Amino acid sequence: MRMTMEEMKNEAETTSMVSMPLYAVMYPVFNELEHVNLSAAQTLRAAFIKAEKENPGLTQDIITKILEKKSVEVNFTESLLRMAADDVEEYMVERPEPEFQELNEKARALKQILSKIPDEINDRVRFLQTIKDIASAIKELLDTVNNVFKKYQYQNRRALEHQKKEFVKYSKSFSDTLKTYFKDGKALNVFISANRLIHQTNLILQTFKTVA
């Protein structure tokens, strides 16, 4: 049975989403290791990237198995969200023009606010302010994306438009999750949705980096 285009896109999104622990958790480890043994760090990074590409979700499996073996009880989704604000070199747009650097900055700002959710969610007043800050950061990122669209022409504009639509879709989904949270109080669903939005933010940068 052949998959529809939408199903293929959804599968691709799920596949890339499960690879989030590679750059959120392992990349900082590799960066630290580079100070000790550059060659070993580069070899290990390349091996993890190759393995993750061939077996999406492998990094997450390895991390959870280590935590289980050490009997460490941790909310992996929450921890991932806390760690996901860091810049990922592979996603940063390298073009020097101000619009592209602003794109990096606005994406970074949104990710940093989202990563604070676990610390703010139990304080209603602070969390409501965080929600307002997230809404502003989303708007600022989209405005910056539109500014880049206006100023620069792209052959592969469809890919950029698609990624922008995906980002908007996940932004709305995040908003819906928040509404549900205020009814059922399930913070985990907010963490999951925030991680997805961070992932979409990285994909916007990655798409611009690829076609720019």
From Swiss-Prot:
It is found in: Cytoplasm; Golgi apparatus membrane; Cell membrane. GO terms for biological process: angiogenesis; apoptotic process. Keywords: Angiogenesis, Apoptosis, Cell membrane, Cytoplasm, Golgi apparatus, Membrane. Signal peptide: none annotated. It is a peripheral membrane protein. The keyword Signal does not apply. Belongs to the PDCD10 family. This is Programmed cell death protein 10. The lineage of its organism: Eukaryota, Metazoa, Chordata, Craniata, Vertebrata.
